[in-house]
Every structure is written in structure tokens, then in C-alpha cells.
């Protein structure tokens, strides 16, 4: 079954893949990394003016990484806003996705956290650096193939 967003993208000949609907009825779409920025701009113009959340996850050990965007159309007088979930899959060998910071400013910390935890680099992000881990940290802690260091630094609480 095709949702409104997928039908709109098909009508305008924009490449995507429908992944169905989640348990709340939110349509989920898969977009290629090279198409993501243009589809993000088009989505904003179409009315998806609010980036509810951005997250990322490791699909499988040694497999793909995914960056997930939850977009919402906020309109005056609408009780149930239209939502869409967009997933962008990238290979772990070169995980690069265009940043949407310049479209939705709320992507700032969220993309940085995805970089910090999974190593997905967001091209054209103004401050693409670690946000939670120290800059000297080696590796990406939320990857399924991450090997945790066997040391723990204890700090004096006083």
C-alpha cells in the first residue's frame, strides 16, 4: 500500500522505496544517500517544516548503517499533523550522508550524535565533531562490531 508521501514522490518522478507503515500508521520511505538532500529540500517545500527527530542505528554487524528522519507537517488548525519517516542506508566503509542542518536547524545536535556514536559523516554540517565522547576517543561505540576498550578511568569525585 502506498502512502500520500510516496504517491507524491512517484507523481514527481523522485526515486524512493516505500517500506510500509509503522504501528502508528506513519509512512516509512527509503531514500538513496545521493538523493537525500534534494528530497529533503522538496519535502520542506511540500510542507514538512518540522524535523521531529533524527537518529541512526547499525542494521547488522558488518552491514549497513541507517540514518532515520521523522518529519512532520505543522499547520495551523490541524489536530493530526501528517508525518513521514525517511531512512537513508549507507555502507559502513564510507558512511556519508548530506547534512540537512541548513534545512532544519534541529538536525544540528542529532546529526552530531549520530556521527559520534556510529561514525556517519554528514557532509556540509557546520560543526561535524564529537558531541558526547572526547575528541581523542577511538571508534564508534554504538556499532555492533565495536570492541570496547578494557580500561576504565576512575576520577576522583572531590
From Swiss-Prot:
Keywords: Chloroplast, Membrane, NAD, NADP, Plastid, Plastoquinone, Quinone, Thylakoid, Translocase, Transport. It holds the Pfam family Complex1_30kDa. One of its GO terms (cellular component) is chloroplast thylakoid membrane. It catalyses: a plastoquinone + NADH + (n+1) H(+)(in) = a plastoquinol + NAD(+) + n H(+)(out); a plastoquinone + NADPH + (n+1) H(+)(in) = a plastoquinol + NADP(+) + n H(+)(out). NDH shuttles electrons from NAD(P)H:plastoquinone, via FMN and iron-sulfur (Fe-S) centers, to quinones in the photosynthetic chain and possibly in a chloroplast respiratory chain. The immediate electron acceptor for the enzyme in this species is believed to be plastoquinone. Couples the redox reaction to proton translocation, and thus conserves the redox energy in a proton gradient. This is NAD(P)H-quinone oxidoreductase subunit J, chloroplastic. GO terms for molecular function: NADH dehydrogenase (ubiquinone) activity; quinone binding. PROSITE patterns: COMPLEX1_30K.
Amino acid at each position: 500500500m502506498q502512502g500520500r508521501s510516496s504517491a507524491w514522490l512517484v507523481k514527481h518522478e523522485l526515486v524512493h522505496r516505500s517500506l510500509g507503515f509503522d504501528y502508528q500508521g506513519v509512512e516509512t520511505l527509503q531514500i538513496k544517500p545521493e538523493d537525500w538532500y534534494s528530497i529533503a529540500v522538496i519535502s520542506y517545500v511540500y510542507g514538512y517544516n518540522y524535523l521531529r527527530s533524527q537518529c541512526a542505528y547499525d542494521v547488522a554487524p558488518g552491514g549497513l548503517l541507517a540514518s532515520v528522519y521523522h518529519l512532520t507537517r505543522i499547520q495551523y488548525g490541524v489536530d493530526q499533523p501528517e508525518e513521514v519517516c525517511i531512512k537513508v542506508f549507507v555502507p559502513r566503509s564510507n558512511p556519508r550522508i548530506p547534512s540537512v542542518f541548513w534545512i532544519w536547524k534541529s538536525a544540528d545536535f542529532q546529526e552530531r550524535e549520530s556521527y559520534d556514536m556510529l561514525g556517519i559523516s554528514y557532509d556540509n554540517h557546520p560543526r561535524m565533531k564529537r558531541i558526547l565522547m572526547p575528541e581523542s576517543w577511538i571508534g564508534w561505540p554504538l556499532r555492533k562490531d565495536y570492541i570496547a576498550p578494557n580500561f576504565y578511568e576512575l576520577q576522583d569525585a572531590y
